[in-house]
Amino acid sequence: MKTRKHTLALMAFFIGVTNVFAQIEGDKIFKNTQILTIELTFHQTSFFDSLEANYLTAEYMKADLVLTDSTGTYSYPEVGVRLKGNSTYNHPNNKKAFKIDFNEYVSGQKHDGIKKLNFSNNFKDPSMMREKVFFDVCKAAGVLVPRSNFANVYFNGTLWGFYTVVEQIDDQFLDWAILDDDGNLFKAGDNFGGSNTPADLVYYGSTASDYTDRYELKTNEDVNDMTDLIDFMDFVNNSTSANFESQLFNKMELNEYLRSVALDNMFSNFDSYTGSARNYYMYHNMSTDKWEWVKWDGNEAFGSYPAGGGGGPGGGGNNVLTIDPDYHDADRPLLENIFASTSLYHAYLLEYCDILENYFNSSYIDPIIDSHYNLIKSSVYADNNKMYTDADFDNNISSNVSSGSGPGGGTIYGLKSFISSRVSYLEGEIDCDDIVSVEDMDKVENLELFPNPASEQITLKWENGVGLDIKILDSKGVLVYQNNPEYINSLNVDVDSWATGIYHLVFTSSNGTAKSQTFSILR
C-alpha cells in the first residue's frame, strides 16, 4: 500500500519551513527533545502541605521560577503553581503532577510565548516515557496532540523528580497547530472516581445544563454557548445512516480523526474516548466550520489502561495485546456509527493500514525509544521519588514489569515487546494488501443522478472516487454548488431554492477523470 499524504503532516512541513524565519511559540521548550531544569522556590512554610490543601479547589500558589532549556536560563517571579491529575495524584509520595501558570500573578508574563505548562509524574510507568513516545508518534502521523518534553524539577533546592512536560491545549496551541483560535474549544470532562457523566458524545437533549459535567468550554467562556457541540451530538445520534455517512466529512476533519482513533487502538490507549470517554478536546474551527479532535493525557498508552473497565492493568476481561481494530466501549455513538458504515469503516482501515506500515512498527518506534532512554537514563536514576526501581526502568524498555497490587501494580508491558506483540496480532487480523488503496479508488464509476427532472432534491450515487470535486453549474456556466466529499458513495443536494432550468453536473476525481451529466429542475 502506498503512503498517503495528510494535511497535518504537510502543515507540519510548511510550518517547519516557515520557522526558518519565524519561530512558533514554545519552540525553546519543545522544538528539540531535551531535559529542562525547573527550579521552583516557594516562600510559604510547609509549602507542600499548602499545595495539597489547594488540590481540590485548583487554587494556585506563588513561587519563583528559574527555567533552563537548550537556549539558556530564564527567571520568572511569582508564577502560579498547583497540583493536578486524577489517578496520577495517587502517586505514593510527594512527586505529584502539577501545573505552572506564568501569568497567574504577573499579568502578561510568559516563557517563549507560553502561558501554562503541565508536568506529568509518569505514574504507573517504569519506562518514564510512555506519554512522550505516544505523543511523538501521533504527531509524526499527522494527529493533533500537545507537544511534550522532559524535565528535572526542583522544589526549594531539592530534586523533586523527573517529569514529562506537556503543552497546554489553549489558544496558543490553536494558533500554531490549527491556525484558528476564534472557535469553541471543549475539553472532555474527567468523569473520574465513579462519576456517571462520561464525555461519550451521546445526545441528552438540547439543554446545555445536561452537558456541563461532561464537557468544559475552554474558549469564549463569556459567551458560554454550547449550541454547536450539542448540534453535533444531535447529528451523530439522530441522523439516518445515509445522512451520517454522507455528511460526517462536512462536520469534522475526518481523516485526522480516523487516524487518531487508529492510534488509540494500536497503542491500546483506552483512557480515551474509545474507552473511558475522557482525555480529549474538540475544537470547532471557524475557518472550515469543522470539528477537530485533539488528544490529551497519553500516560496510559502501551496497554496500561484496561479495555472494558476493570480497575487496572490486566483488568476488564480483555487482553490489550489482542484488541481488534474496531474495539470500543459501549455507548460511543461516534465510533459505533463510523464502524457501522461500510464506506467509513473502509476509510478507517485505509488510515489504519497507513499508520501500521509507516509508524506503528518496531522499525519506526524502537529508535525513538532508544534515543529517549539514552537521554533520560541518568535523570531517572537520580529520581529518588519515582515509583519503580532503576532495574524496572531498564527492563521496562523491552520487557514486562510486575510490581504487586494496588495503584501502579500488576503487569506493565514493556514498550518494545508491546509494539512487536501488537503488530504481530494486527497483521494477522488485517490484510492491508486487500484494503483498496486510495490510488486504486480514484476512478469514478457508475455515476447516477436522480430524479431527473428534479424539484426539491437530487441524489448522487457513484462507485469509487477519491479526492472528488463535484461542481454544478447553471445554463450560463455560473457555479451554483461545489463539494469535495471523502469516503462516501452518495450525496443529497437540496435544490428547492434553485431556479427552474438546465444544470450541468461535473464530477472530477484525483486522477483527473471527469464525468458530466445534464439535468433539469422543473416545478
What label would you give each PLM region?
Residues T18-F21, M441-F450, A454-R523:
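C-terminal outer-membrane/trafficking sorting elements
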Residues A141-N152, S272:
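Short, well-structured beta-strand/strand-turn elements
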Residues I24-I29, T33-L36, S46, Y55, ...:
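Middle-to-C-terminal accessory/interaction subdomains
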Residues F123-V143:
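A conserved alpha-helical element in kinase catalytic cores
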Residues M61-A63, K96-F98, N149, V466-I470:
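Short beta-strand/loop motifs in extracellular/secreted proteins, especially
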